[in-house]
Regions:
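Binuclear metal-dependent phosphoesterase catalytic core
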Residues: 103-110, 116-125, 137-222
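Short aromatic-enriched loop/helix-cap "lid" or pocket-rim segments at secondary-structure transitions
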Residues: 8, 67-72, 164, 198-200
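His/acidic metal-ligating clusters that form di-metal
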Residues: 16-136
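Structural recognition of the beta-strand scaffold that forms the well-ordered cores
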Residues: 9, 54-58, 129-133, 142, ...
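Short catalytic/ligand-binding loop motif for oxyanion handling, primarily in non-cytosolic enzymes
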Residues: 5-6, 64-68, 139-142, 159-160
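Extracellular low-complexity, Gly/Ser/Thr-rich intrinsically disordered linkers
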Residues: 133-140, 239
């Protein structure tokens, strides 16, 4: 019995930016999806009972089902994030009913324009209890939809864009061999391990607030702290302009 497979971990190639497949991000190939199903059958046969082995999968780009961890809200909702590409024009926040405590949505989910049925394939294969992705550096939520956990880990370094320094980190997984489905996961963040600030907070600030399109601008304006800051700057500028006009008026009056 000691030679039996208790649980498995798989990595799938989501193929990045693949213009041969779509106008947007690529998707796992049909061969990769078939492999994810076939390997479960093979492990079940090796174990002798044909039962699906509890398994967790990892890949870079999330499938469209990650949007099912969100709830659509009006565009004026504070901290709402506008969807990307196929989901553009719709605004979302985390669905707290399906997401674990501590989950964060920091940016749009950057998935492929096409749904190739990967999540459904994992369900059909049996045994898969979670799929975790990266790609969207500011996201760190874990939600349970379609009978499977869908989750993120944020960026952990400082050579690329991401959230505030204290929110960058790695995701730790703890599995029990006798029940891997009831796993425990948590983030080990820079704020917890090192401190709140990095050695280059100016760069981190720019990366956190940098926008490259209208969607990014709208998302920034939904962040209350950004709105308050802009209102404060606007108030100071209006006060300064009013003071200058008053001085100019007095000069003409003389």
């Amino acid at each position: 019995r000691e030679s039996l497979t208790s649980y498995a971990k798989y990595a799938s190639n989501s193929r990045g930016w693949d213009l041969a497949d779509s106008d947007g991000y690529g998707t796992p190939s049909p061969e990769a999806i078939e492999w994810l199903k076939q390997v479960q059958r093979e492990l079940g046969e090796r174990n002798g009972d044909g039962s699906a082995v509890p398994a967790i999968a990892f890949q870079h780009i999330p499938p469209q089902e990650f949007y099912d961890c969100l709830r659509e809200v009006p565009a004026y909702t504070p901290n709402a994030v506008e969807g990307a590409r196929t989901f553009a024009g719709h605004c979302y926040v985390l669905d707290r009913d399906v997401c674990r405590p501590g989950s964060r949505l920091g940016e749009a989910i950057g998935c492929a324009d096409e749904n190739v049925g990967e999540v459904q394939a994992l369900r059909d294969a049996g045994g898969y209890f979670a799929l975790f992705c990266g790609h969207d550096h500011k996201n760190s939520f874990v939600g349970h939809v379609h009978d499977i956990d869908l989750g993120y880990a944020p960026t952990c370094g400082f050579e690329c864009y991401g959230p505030k320094s204290r929110l960058r980190g790695i995701r730790l997984f703890e599995f029990r061999e006798n029940n891997p489905v009831s796993y425990v996961t948590r983030l080990l963040t820079w704020g917890d391990l090192v401190g709140r600030y990095s050695s280059n907070e100016l760069r981190v600030f720019f990366e956190d607030h940098c926008v490259t399109d209208l969607i990014g601008i709208r998302n920034e304006l939904r962040r209350p702290q950004v709105t308050v800051t802009l209102l404060g700057i606007g108030s100071v500028m209006c006060a300064a302009a009013g003071h200058a006009i008053a001085k100019l008026f007095k000069r003409f009056k003389r």
